[in-house]
Amino acid sequence: MSELPKWHGTTILSVRKGGKVVVIGDGQVSMGNTVMKPNARKVRKLGDGSVIGGFAGATADAFTLFDRLERKLEQHGGQLLRAAVELAKDWRTDKYLRNLEAMMIVADREVTLILTGNGDVLEPVGGVAAIGSGGNFALSAARALVDYEADAETICRKAMAIAADLCVFTNDSLTIETLDSAA
């Protein structure tokens, strides 16, 4: 089994609440202890725009995975869960993919998924998911806020501000994508 990469350099968070699903990510790219770029775009719409996702890990590896996920979405009629499972199968069996160092959060109207560096597909509990170096900070903050009146985007912004205050590899230059949710 391959060793999981050390995640440093980003925080990605997703919250599903009140008929919306939001994926938000910071823009910091770090090489060691140096900030190389403060405003990278690690969150984007995929395929025809019905799926949104964000990545943590090696940028080139993440774009490879985004491209492959988009192909799987095309092959499976835009069904995110099916496309993610098929990508995970490839990830586990393809020698090249097994060496990629990236994780992703992807979401559509129906489901939010975490795709791990081991080829796992996880559906988070309570509609909140986070990855990356500041992921645990953002996840904790979002879970604490989700039961209150705030909407999904407000929760994401506040949780990311907390993560940026606590994680030196996370900043407050945010990219946000939102979809209407079935739930």
Swiss-Prot record:
<dbReference type="GO" id="GO:0009376">
    <property type="term" value="C:HslUV protease complex"/>
</dbReference>
<dbReference type="GO" id="GO:0004298">
    <property type="term" value="F:threonine-type endopeptidase activity"/>
</dbReference>
<comment type="subunit">
    <text>A double ring-shaped homohexamer of HslV is capped on each side by a ring-shaped HslU homohexamer. The assembly of the HslU/HslV complex is dependent on binding of ATP.</text>
</comment>
<dbReference type="InterPro" id="IPR029055">
    <property type="entry name" value="Ntn_hydrolases_N"/>
</dbReference>
<dbReference type="GO" id="GO:0005839">
    <property type="term" value="C:proteasome core complex"/>
</dbReference>
<keyword id="KW-0915">Sodium</keyword>
<dbReference type="Pfam" id="PF00227">
    <property type="entry name" value="Proteasome"/>
</dbReference>
<comment type="function">
    <text>Protease subunit of a proteasome-like degradation complex believed to be a general protein degrading machinery.</text>
</comment>
<feature type="binding site">
    <location>
        <position position="167"/>
    </location>
    <ligand>
        <name>Na(+)</name>
    </ligand>
</feature>
<dbReference type="InterPro" id="IPR023333">
    <property type="entry name" value="Proteasome_suB-type"/>
</dbReference>
<protein>
    <recommendedName>
        <fullName>ATP-dependent protease subunit HslV</fullName>
        <ecNumber>3.4.25.2</ecNumber>
    </recommendedName>
</protein>
<comment type="similarity">
    <text>Belongs to the peptidase T1B family. HslV subfamily.</text>
</comment>
<dbReference type="InterPro" id="IPR001353">
    <property type="entry name" value="Proteasome_sua/b"/>
</dbReference>
<feature type="active site">
    <location>
        <position position="10"/>
    </location>
</feature>
<dbReference type="InterPro" id="IPR022281">
    <property type="entry name" value="ATP-dep_Prtase_HsIV_su"/>
</dbReference>
<feature type="binding site">
    <location>
        <position position="164"/>
    </location>
    <ligand>
        <name>Na(+)</name>
    </ligand>
</feature>
<keyword id="KW-0645">Protease</keyword>
<keyword id="KW-0021">Allosteric enzyme</keyword>
<keyword id="KW-0479">Metal-binding</keyword>
<dbReference type="GO" id="GO:0046872">
    <property type="term" value="F:metal ion binding"/>
</dbReference>
<keyword id="KW-0963">Cytoplasm</keyword>
<keyword id="KW-0378">Hydrolase</keyword>
<keyword id="KW-0888">Threonine protease</keyword>
<dbReference type="GO" id="GO:0051603">
    <property type="term" value="P:proteolysis involved in protein catabolic process"/>
</dbReference>
<feature type="binding site">
    <location>
        <position position="170"/>
    </location>
    <ligand>
        <name>Na(+)</name>
    </ligand>
</feature>
